[in-house]
Amino acid sequence: MTLRELILLCKNGFPDGALGLARNLFEQFIIISVFEAQCEGVDRDRMVEKYYADYNVQRYKNLNTMCRYAGQKEKMQDYENELAKLRKQFSVSKLKDYWWSGHYSFTDMCEYVIEHTDGNYKTMVINLYFAYKRACCSLHASNFGNANRLGNCLATIDLSPLDEGQEYALDLAIKSFIMVVAVMYRELGMDYKKSNKKLNQLATFYQSITQKE
């Protein structure tokens, strides 16, 4: 669904929105890669358990914030208690956004994945991470990001509503999507060769466009 939305945004001349979705696919790629790098057995099972528990962590944290600003102190305390139970259950002192992975931030997760890869694949992950950081700079509400969205040629990535700039989002998205699809096909016991070939052809095509600039 994310990739379909991304393609529609590119088709209609909105590469900035597409780049935002490409970032999401890269984040999914990193999350899957962390699980892939984790050894099989008890440790990995525990990580999966934490990942699913994070649903309630994020829910309680958001409800807690809503209650705080609504002046509902009793409900706020109830959510604090639920979060305390989860901290105790999983023996963690803080429930950061990526606590379940054992890393404090998304950057730490990226570095972990890079450290656990080698050869050409490692080079690809590093390049994707650079593209991700570049996308973040382009989309954040900073002076650079705002100028970029207006189509400032000095920003190097044209994200104004034109025919240009689509390739950056598509390149990052497809390369990230390849890993997501590969793991999904494997877990479902499906043959991945045909889809892998087509996705790699797309990745090569988009990469060739970005390299011409």
Regions found by a protein language model. Name each.
Residues T2, L21, E40-G41, L150:
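Residue-level detector of alpha-helical recognition elements and their boundaries
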Residues L6, L25, I32-S33, C39, ...:
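Alpha-helical solenoid scaffolds that mediate protein-protein interactions
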Residues K50-E213:
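Secondary-shell segments that build the walls of catalytic and ion/ligand-binding clefts
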Residues A18, E36-M47, M190-K198:
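Short, glycine/acidic-rich hinge or "gate" loops at secondary-structure transitions
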Residues M1-F35:
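Long, hydrophobic/aromatic-enriched structural stretches that serve as scaffold segments
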